[in-house]
Amino acid sequence: MVTPTKHAIGLRSASGVELLAHIGLDTVTFDGTPFSLKVKEGDTVKKGEVLVEFDKAFIEDIEESALHQKIFTVVS
């Protein structure tokens, strides 16, 4: 799963474990501006592969604590 705003990516392992990677707190409000996706929904990814890149300065200018909060949630 990749959100349209590019701030969150959902992953599912071969064994079915699901993980949500969420960058920042209110980064959904940026409407994708500071993010550059390197994968698309349905892609198979490997350890070490870059999933998303983002403009750290852009996020820090707007949301001082955004990059100090990275949320990873196992959903299964």
UniProtKB/Swiss-Prot annotation:
UniProt GO BP: phosphoenolpyruvate-dependent sugar phosphotransferase system
Active-site residues annotated for this sequence: 22
Domain notes for this protein: The EIIA domain is phosphorylated by phospho-HPr on a histidyl residue. Then, it transfers the phosphoryl group to the EIIB domain.
Domain PTS EIIA type-1, residue spans: 1-76
GO MF terms, alphabetically ordered: kinase activity
Pfam families: PTS_EIIA_1
Subcellular location: Cytoplasm
Main location: cytoplasm
GO CC entries: cytoplasm
Key word Kinase present: yes
Keyword check for NADP: no
Name of protein: Putative phosphotransferase enzyme IIA component YyzE
Keywords: Cytoplasm, Kinase, Phosphotransferase system, Sugar transport, Transferase, Transport
Gene: yyzE
Organism: Bacillus subtilis (strain 168)
Function as written in the Swiss-Prot or TrEMBL entry: The phosphoenolpyruvate-dependent sugar phosphotransferase system (PTS), a major carbohydrate active -transport system, catalyzes the phosphorylation of incoming sugar substrates concomitant with their translocation across the cell membrane.
InterPro entries given in the database record: Dup_hybrid_motif, PTS_EIIA_1_perm, PTS_EIIA_component
Origin organism lineage: Bacteria, Bacillati, Bacillota, Bacilli, Bacillales
